[in-house]
């Protein structure tokens, strides 16, 4: 989850989110994997496969007259273009691009590419409750074909976005990610497996001066969660507290730091007029590596608060590529398995594994 930092004493509590419920004990796997939907794909993924993922923005609104609900036509393509630029210039070659979906699940050409507008009675909701509620699952389009991004106003103004973590498929393993023991069609997902961003900040698009609510950084951060990345700062594996000096993102090339201590420092230096000068941004973007004591500048997309949010590391790139090539509910070709997959543990007849859904808070 990415959150907004407000310049008040009450705001410190807003940074207590965590990538809750994850298993920190798994180790990355190195095998090939099943082919996704249990059928033989025409195209198989390789390390050189370039992914172009169709995106659909589900815009939930109650009144067309409310621009923070009914996002202006033509704006979301600009947002996605900026997201593509950010990922294309993040310092590693993800071989990844996003495009607005052109057809809906029924094969109809979309009059507004990549945008699915849904009129609802109340367009202000709790995003965590939304991602857990089976009642909203039917809004999602086939996750094997589309990246679903939901937009509505969050009840909590401080929340910028949250995301579902991806799955690996038995016998594959990626540290910190939930695992499916058997493949199930996307139509059986009993919750909205998606990315969410708060539409209150949808127009904070590449502002002239620094804003912690800048939408491109928020959306890139949540998409990266969806593709298997965790926060760059330390999170306790038992309590999920950020007041810890450990490295928990499974990437040795991303420096870690104590987020709770940094938040106290940020609170005491936050501009109460909300204006960030370049000098102040440079000051507040500096962190202290909690393992080595060395100073570093926060540029990683998987950080937040005051950060440049414009880089990923080679090991983060490797995790994203692993998910792209193997995760069942991420669009695009999957790797071909040459050997017979290890059988999943036997289950009672007719009994299916509950989805081990985990949300990146």
Region locations from a protein language model:
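Positively charged n-region of N-terminal signal peptides that target proteins for export
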Residues: 1-4
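Extracytoplasmic/secreted envelope proteins and their assembly/folding machinery
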Residues: 77-80, 84, 194, 220, ...
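Metzincin-family zinc-dependent endopeptidase catalytic domain
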Residues: 90-219, 226-271
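Propeptide-to-catalytic entry region of secreted or membrane-anchored zinc metalloproteases
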Residues: 18-147, 152-155, 321, 325-361
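Extracellular/periplasmic catalytic domains that process cell-envelope and extracellular macromolecules
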Residues: 46-51, 91, 139-144, 187-191, ...
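C-terminal motif of bacterial Sec signal peptides marking the signal peptidase cleavage site
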Residues: 13-16
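Soluble non-cytosolic domains of exported or imported proteins
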Residues: 70-78, 209-214, 218, 296, ...
